[in-house]
């Protein structure tokens, strides 16, 4: 994420004193899941065989970072297009994608994916959904926001799960979330994250990094000093935020709302969660924009219900919301509010969404 400076980054570096192929920094940190804004599921007994990785400083195994598997025979380079399309090198599937309503200046952009195959058998299911809201018409101070929903199921409840976001400068942990600011090199951006899931009583927020822990992997540091060339921007990064549930469970969900602004902006858009008593949907409101996801990040053929509470009008200072309903099968759907039809809507194959103006109330999406 870049706004008036890099805010959420890929950390580590190929260049440096220890960044090249098969160097400790390269294979244990920089090329691994832990160095990126992704999800970890830590099985303490997992082995990451890497003997066939390129370079001279070979080792039998790489460090256990809790991340995604190393495809191929001991992390061997894929050598043909046929192999690239094989099951071994298949690491994900796009479930839905789209934007609208304008093709030139879309108000929303959606991407949903299944990344289960990127992990070993320690992960039974892993899906991630993004919605980016263009807020330039709504707010001068907060021109953009992103809602990120992750659902992860591990094969063992004891395997700890982590949601990661990397930064150059030190993040600040706050009640219910965190912020990342840019203060150097003429940059002035700020990223503000509101954590809606895990719930507050089950949430641990920790920042990791700083001198001696910039490239930290579960108790070990894999340093990579800068070259003689000046690196005042330090785009290799030095910090990350880790979100994790306190309680052990096979299945966990993460729901985060990220707002982008200038670091001098103190008043952000209000954020709240859309809940569903039957646990079929998960959703969030930021400003006057709202999104509802199918709880399993899949496509529903039957529909579902959810509620935008009356209190949302006061909290968000609006009587109308631009509502994105996702996770629907292709075809014709009816949306009801408080038992009254709002009309029929045609849902496309690629995006699986309905976008409409909506007031608080109880909603039912049905065939």
Language-model features, listed with the residues they occupy:
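Catalytic and substrate-binding regions of extracellular carbohydrate-active enzymes
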Residues: 1-184, 248-264, 272-276
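Short, isolated positions in well-ordered beta-strands
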Residues: 7-8, 180, 188-189, 289-293, ...
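A short, sequence-level motif marking secondary-structure junctions
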Residues: 11-17, 129-134, 168, 196-203, ...
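Solvent-exposed beta-strand/loop surfaces of large extracellular or lumenal domains
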Residues: 14, 20-23, 173-184, 216-232, ...
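Extracellular beta-rich ligand/substrate-recognition surface
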Residues: 116-123, 232-234, 313-315
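Non-catalytic terminal regions with compositionally biased, polar/charged low complexity
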Residues: 135-142, 175, 248-252, 259-367
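Beta-strand-rich recognition/accessory modules
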Residues: 155, 209-289
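Polysaccharide-binding surfaces and accessory modules of carbohydrate-active proteins
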Residues: 161-217
């Amino acid at each position: 994420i870049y706004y008036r400076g890099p805010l959420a980054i890929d950390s580590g570096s190929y260049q440096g004193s220890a960044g090249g192929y098969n160097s400790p920094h390269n294979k244990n940190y920089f090329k691994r899941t832990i160095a990126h804004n992704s999800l970890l599921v830590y099985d303490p007994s997992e082995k990451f065989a890497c003997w066939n990785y390129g370079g001279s400083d070979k080792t039998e195994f790489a460090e256990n970072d809790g991340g995604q598997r190393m495809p191929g025979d001991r992390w061997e380079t894929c050598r043909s297009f046929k192999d690239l399309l094989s099951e071994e090198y298949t690491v994900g599937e796009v479930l839905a994608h789209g934007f609208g309503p304008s093709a030139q200046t879309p108000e929303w952009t959606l991407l949903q994916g299944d990344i289960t195959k990127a992990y070993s058998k320690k992960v039974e299911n892993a899906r991630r959904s993004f919605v980016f809201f263009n807020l330039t018409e709504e707010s001068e101070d907060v021109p953009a926001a992103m809602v990120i929903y992750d659902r992860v199921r591990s094969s063992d409840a004891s395997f700890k799960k982590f949601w990661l976001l990397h930064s150059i400068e030190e993040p600040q942990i706050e009640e219910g979330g965190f912020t990342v600011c840019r203060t150097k090199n003429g940059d002035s951006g700020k990223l503000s994250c509101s954590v809606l899931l895990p719930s507050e009583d089950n949430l641990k927020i920790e920042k990791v990094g700083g001198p001696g822990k910039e490239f930290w992997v579960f108790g070990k540091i894999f340093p990579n000093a800068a070259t003689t060339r000046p690196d005042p921007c330090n785009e290799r990064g030095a910090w990350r935020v880790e979100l994790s549930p306190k309680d052990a469970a096979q299945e966990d969900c993460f729901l985060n709302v990220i707002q982008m602004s200038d670091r001098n902006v103190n008043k952000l858009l209000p954020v709240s969660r859309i809940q569903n008593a039957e646990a079929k949907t998960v959703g969030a409101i930021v400003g006057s924009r709202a999104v509802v996801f199918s709880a399993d990040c899949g496509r529903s053929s039957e529909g579902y219900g959810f509620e935008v509470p009356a209190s949302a009008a006061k909290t968000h200072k609006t009587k109308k919301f631009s509502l994105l309903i996702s996770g629907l099968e292709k075809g014709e759907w009816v949306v009801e509010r408080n038992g009254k039809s709002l009309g029929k809507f045609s849902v496309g194959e690629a995006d699986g969404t309905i976008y409409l103006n909506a007031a608080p109330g109880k909603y039912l999406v049905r065939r």
